[in-house]
């Protein structure tokens, strides 16, 4: 009798131990490496295993206290979405932000391709994981060309494997996630510190005082000098526009300093009025390393932009007041079929109309 009771007691103790281990693993399984096989112990618990292979590259850390550079997607998300990394620096920022926003809106997991990671990760603390090329090539994608403003159909995309394309850079896609977008596009410390060091050395020309208000000025030139008039019946920002924009800030802010960056710095030095001693040409204009100029602009208090996504993102991240070039194409421009000003510029930004007279001159026989 005693032996039987002792045996039953041992079996009961063993059963309690096994159940305790199962309960512990069930509660704490997120602390173990992803993919730990608990399905045998907990058959009702299905592991969410993505139908893709990913790899994380340097620069995708979630934060200074993150223990892993590979962010974990919430279990409620499914599918795999990505975006073609087309265009230059500002274009790819727009594609990244739009992918992130649309994927969240539709309950999908977002991944970026290696080329986008190579363009953005050296500059920002981005967190989206990277899709392996071999998985990209094997995935049965449906491709979707986006236009540059949010549409109702984009809120109900049911494709589990979707590859976005186009050049979206409209606040209407992602402005409801502004703080998250700003975190994604947080500069690495060394870039921020370098930009702040440059700004800290600036002095007002007439008094030698430290400026208290910095206005970043981005002047887009380069290929736009031909593309805008020849293809889009448009203009780029001229000296008259820049003078009006600077005067707008001078009237509203005490002793601002204008920090000019451009991919046409020689033109800027010859055409921007510096007689008031409040203009400095601080950018290096190197299109191969745009993040230096970009970092400078984002560390300013306010922004003057001409045209282009580079200037948009500098203004969006800097915050403060923004003045932009408005109505820079003729009314019959094909550009207006793919570009909506009300979706491109935030409502609180201030537009100054472009001078279109050079285009009317070209149009005359």
From Swiss-Prot:
Cellular component annotations (GO), alphabetically ordered: extracellular space; Golgi apparatus; Golgi cisterna membrane; Golgi membrane; membrane; plasma membrane
Glycosylation sites: 65, 327
Transmembrane segments: 9-25
Lumenal side: 26-365
Chain segments annotated as coiled-coil in the UniProt record: none
Transmembrane in keyword set: yes
Pfam families, per database record: Glyco_transf_11
Residue intervals annotated with topology Cytoplasmic: 1-8
Membrane topology value: Single-pass type II membrane protein
Keywords (A to Z) from UniProt: Blood group antigen, Glycoprotein, Glycosyltransferase, Golgi apparatus, Lipid metabolism, Membrane, Signal-anchor, Transferase, Transmembrane, Transmembrane helix
Domain of life: Eukaryota
Catalytic activity field: a beta-D-galactosyl-(1->4)-N-acetyl-beta-D-glucosaminyl derivative + GDP-beta-L-fucose = an alpha-L-Fuc-(1->2)-beta-D-Gal-(1->4)-beta-D-GlcNAc derivative + GDP + H(+); a ganglioside GA1 + GDP-beta-L-fucose = a ganglioside Fuc-GA1 + GDP + H(+); a beta-D-Gal-(1->3)-beta-D-GlcNAc-(1->3)-beta-D-Gal-(1->4)-beta-D-Glc-(1<->1')-Cer(d18:1(4E)) + GDP-beta-L-fucose = alpha-L-fucosyl-(1->2)- beta-D-galactosyl-(1->3)-N-acetyl-beta-D-glucosaminyl-(1->3)-beta-D-galactosyl-(1->4)-beta-D-glucosyl-(1<->1')-N-acylsphing-4-enine + GDP + H(+); a neolactoside nLc4Cer(d18:1(4E)) + GDP-beta-L-fucose = a neolactoside IV(2)-alpha-Fuc-nLc4Cer(d18:1(4E)) + GDP + H(+)
Other information: There are two genes (FUT1 and FUT2) which encode galactoside 2-L-fucosyltransferase. They are expressed in a tissue-specific manner with expression restricted to cells of mesodermal or endodermal origin respectively.
Family statement: Belongs to the glycosyltransferase 11 family.
Protein's UniProt name: Galactoside alpha-(1,2)-fucosyltransferase 1
Organism: Homo sapiens (Human)
């Amino acid at each position: 009798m005693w032996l039987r009771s002792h045996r039953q007691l041992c079996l009961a103790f063993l059963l309690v131990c096994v159940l305790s281990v199962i309960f512990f693993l069930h509660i704490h399984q997120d602390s173990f490496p992803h993919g730990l096989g608990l399905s045998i112990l907990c058959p009702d618990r299905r592991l969410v295993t993505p139908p893709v292979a990913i790899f994380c590259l340097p620069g995708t850390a979630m934060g200074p206290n993150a223990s892993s550079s590979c962010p974990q997607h919430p279990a409620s998300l499914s599918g795999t979405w990505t975006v073609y990394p087309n265009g230059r620096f500002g274009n790819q920022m727009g594609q990244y932000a739009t992918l992130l926003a649309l994927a969240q809106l539709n309950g999908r997991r977002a991944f970026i391709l290696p080329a986008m990671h190579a363009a953005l990760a050296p500059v920002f603390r981005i967190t989206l994981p990277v899709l392996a090329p071999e998985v990209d090539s094997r995935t049965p994608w449906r491709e979707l060309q986006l236009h540059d403003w949010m549409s109702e159909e984009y809120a109900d995309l049911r494709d589990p494997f979707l590859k976005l394309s186009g050049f979206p850079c409209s606040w209407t896609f992602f402005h409801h996630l502004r703080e998250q977008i700003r975190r994604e596009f947080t500069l690495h410390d060394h870039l921020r510190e370098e930009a702040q060091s440059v700004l800290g050395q600036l002095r007002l020309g007439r008094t030698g005082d430290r400026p208290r208000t910095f206005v970043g000025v981005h002047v887009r030139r380069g290929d736009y000098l031909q593309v805008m008039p020849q293809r889009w019946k448009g203009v780029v920002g001229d000296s008259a526009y820049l003078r009006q924009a600077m005067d707008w800030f001078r009237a509203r802010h005490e002793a601002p300093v204008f920090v000019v960056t451009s991919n046409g710095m020689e033109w800027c030095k010859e055409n921007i009025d510096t007689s008031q001693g409040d203009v400095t040409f601080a950018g290096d204009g190197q299109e191969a390393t745009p993040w230096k100029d970009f970092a400078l602009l984002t560390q300013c208090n306010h922004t003057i932009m001409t045209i282009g996504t580079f200037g948009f993102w500098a203004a969006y991240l800097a915050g403060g007041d923004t003045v932009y070039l408005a109505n820079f194409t003729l009314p019959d421009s094909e550009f207006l079929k793919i570009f909506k000003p009300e979706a491109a510029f935030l409502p609180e930004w201030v537009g100054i109309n472009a001078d279109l007279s050079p285009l009317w001159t070209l149009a005359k026989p």
